[in-house]
């Protein structure tokens, strides 16, 4: 079940490859994720010391959060992947133009997972093409809908 999508990443980047990673979350974060209080748009993934971290992903605390814990909504969260997958990612990210971006957050077997994408930035022209394609699809859907009535 999907929790949150990063539509901006799909618009701004060509996604070359997708990977699934587990997330290390605190208790209040899991409760907020369950309520859907997640925002991935400003998030990105970095590799430090052979480990993956997601930065800029915002998980807003619930109003009923505990008083003895100070929730930090944009704290850096560790991502869990196998070492060989991380090594492969390091090799690809070192190539010019590649970056890692969070694509979506979802539940899998009761655990929160984050789908990250190996991405290459789009130019302005590519973004305009994406908008044109999207508008064309909308027009076709409208025509089909009005035709079926």
Swiss-Prot record:
Residues 121-149 are annotated as: Disordered. One of its GO terms (cellular component) is cytosol. It holds the Pfam family SmpB. GO terms for biological process: trans-translation. Transmembrane segments: none annotated. Required for rescue of stalled ribosomes mediated by trans-translation. Binds to transfer-messenger RNA (tmRNA), required for stable association of tmRNA with ribosomes. tmRNA and SmpB together mimic tRNA shape, replacing the anticodon stem-loop with SmpB. tmRNA is encoded by the ssrA gene; the 2 termini fold to resemble tRNA(Ala) and it encodes a 'tag peptide', a short internal open reading frame. During trans-translation Ala-aminoacylated tmRNA acts like a tRNA, entering the A-site of stalled ribosomes, displacing the stalled mRNA. NCBIfam families: PRK05422.1, smpB. This is SsrA-binding protein. PROSITE patterns: SSRP (PS01317). The keyword Nucleotidyltransferase does not apply. It comes from the Bacteria. It is found in: Cytoplasm. Belongs to the SmpB family. InterPro entries: SmpB, SsrA-bd_prot, SsrA-bd_prot_CS. GO terms for molecular function: RNA binding. Its main location: cytoplasm. Keywords: Cytoplasm, RNA-binding. Disulfide bonds: none annotated.
